[in-house]
Amino acid sequence: MKKKQKITLYRIIITAVMLVVLQFLPITGIPRLIAYLAAYLVIGYDILRKAGKGILNGRAFDENFLMALATLGAFFLAIWTKSGDYLEGIAVMLFYQIGELFQSYAVGKSRKNISALMDIRPDYANIEKDGKLEQVDPDEVAVGSIIVVQPGEKVPLDGVVESGNASLNTSALTGESLPRDVKEGDEIISGCINLNGVLKIRTTKEFGESTVSKILDLVENASSRKSRSEAFISRFAKIYTPAVCISAVLLGIAVPLLRMAFGMDVAWVDWIYRALTFLVVSCPCALVISIPLSFFAGIGGASHEGVLIKGSNYLEALSDAKIVVFDKTGTLTQGVFEVTAVHHNTMDEAKLLEYAALAECASSHPISKSLQKAYGKEIDRSRVTDIEEVSGKGITAKVDGHEVLAGNAKLMALHNISYNDCHSVGTIIHMSIDGEYAGHIVISDVIKPHSKEAIQKLKHAGVEKTVMLTGDAKRVADQVAKELGIDEVRSELLPGDKVNEVEKLIQNKPKKANLAFVGDGINDAPVLTRADIGIAMGAMGSDAAIEAADVVLMDDDPMQIAKAIKISRKCIGIVKQNIVFSLIIKFGCLALTAFGLANMWAAIFADVGVMIIAVLNAIRALKYKE
């Protein structure tokens, strides 16, 4: 509890004790008024001061003004009627302050939780000087410097591991509890915690450009981007508060005057009491406080799961996502070619793979790398001679004196070698040894383990259509889409075509449905920007993703997409619950008050009670459960 909150708590306790004591003190008249006025000032002086400042600054119609007017009015009413019943006015202020303290504590707890979840800001960096480690501010470390990260310390800057190996806790960035292992030569990003081992890292970015700085900046600025709901509440409060003040004046003055004109009993005290109660009931605290808090908690809860949402406007838009468009490579697939099948004739499978890897050893093409990876042994280049690349067809070479052809069907046709057709999805490498067809190897982009389940979860979450965009051939794209259960495919696209396809989908979508585009953030910036919601996946270390997207998924697991949508819908559900609940209770109590069926105590519940319930509901957005 902060110092300001402690002072408020002490004031509440002192006032409560004073009220209990005053109930048993046999004092009347002026001494009684002074004693109760002292209790009132102890609990309400700050509200009176804020109300006064608001009037002087031209912002009279706020909750402080309503509370000050209602409670002072109750005091003057007790003085006027000489009843000596000052308890209600003080009780209203006391319970209002209890509600404010609770709200302040809840907001503070939410902020603390979010700070803990995003506790990735490094305090220092270790630089080695004269054989000793010196702690310096991360801002002072230049690009290319060597920093040392010891067990238990945060990685302060992005870089490459020069020496050492360790396990890293990346949970604050990705929401993933399993440690990530790094070794010499691996890229490493700031914000991770070194669990074991000493790492020497060569920095590749300044602190201001590092991943941790960009993420912190994103989270800190999220509250500045207001949602439609928050904008509505702001507009509502500007109209609502003056309207209820005018209604209270009409209730307390106009109604008695009207009754007087018709010769009815005026009952000034009764109607003024109703007007003051009306003011207490009307305070819009529950809405003004709980709606922004709901979004704040929702964004914080999402960040704990490795989902960074740039503002409450994007969180609200994400909740209306009905169409999700995927870029295939790197999003639904690994984006890395692998040997997925070896179909051989008489030659042994391992031997066929060995010939292919050796023949392709001079190439830097991804296909060559995937063959060498599948072979898994060190390449002995002395075994290979006469390597020749046949443009658009493949490679010819001599391996251990044998003439080897490795390429597509065109290469086989060029050398008049009959080959077997392959219906597997992927790139087919046909192999010929000494003029005889030896078989073929299938290389393809591997689908991520959770992609199919991710599509199913999206449909369960209410997404009506899934679309895949890819530059792959139609046959390959259709096969992937069928395997994953994707509704529509756009294949054989050039990079610029993707924006046009998204434009068409946006033009044809239902009016209130939003389109979300999911990419890996590397070359998708134009499409991420054009979609209603741009979602970048696997953004650890990707500046482009963090800059271009509205929602950033720190992990490359497609399951995170459905999780992000569910979090947004839970948050918006809480916002709607609070709006409906608050307005029903408020207007119900206002009607009861106007007809004289609710007293000041009911007014306190309608204000403070509703605010506490709404705040409790709002902080539910911090937690996400499957």
Which residues are covered by each model-predicted region?
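Conserved cytosolic catalytic loops of P-type ATPases
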Residues: M1, A116-E209, N313-A356, K398-V399
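Soluble-to-membrane junctions at the N-terminal ends of transmembrane alpha-helices
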Residues: M1-V17, I34, L48-F76, L216-L250, ...
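Transmembrane helix-loop-helix hairpins at the membrane interface
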Residues: K2-Y124, K226, R235, P242, ...
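Membrane-water interface of transmembrane alpha-helices in multipass transporters/channels
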Residues: G29-L37, A60-L66, T81-V92, F232, ...
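Conserved catalytic phosphorylation-site environment of P-type ATPases
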Residues: N57, E63-T71, L173, Y273, ...
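Juxtamembrane coupling segments of multi-pass membrane pumps/enzymes
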Residues: F65-L66, M93-P151, A172, V182, ...
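P-type ATPase nucleotide-binding
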Residues: V339, H343-K465, K474, I486-V502
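Conserved ATP-binding TGD loop and adjacent catalytic N/P-domain core of P-type ATPases
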Residues: V399-G401, T427, I433-Q577
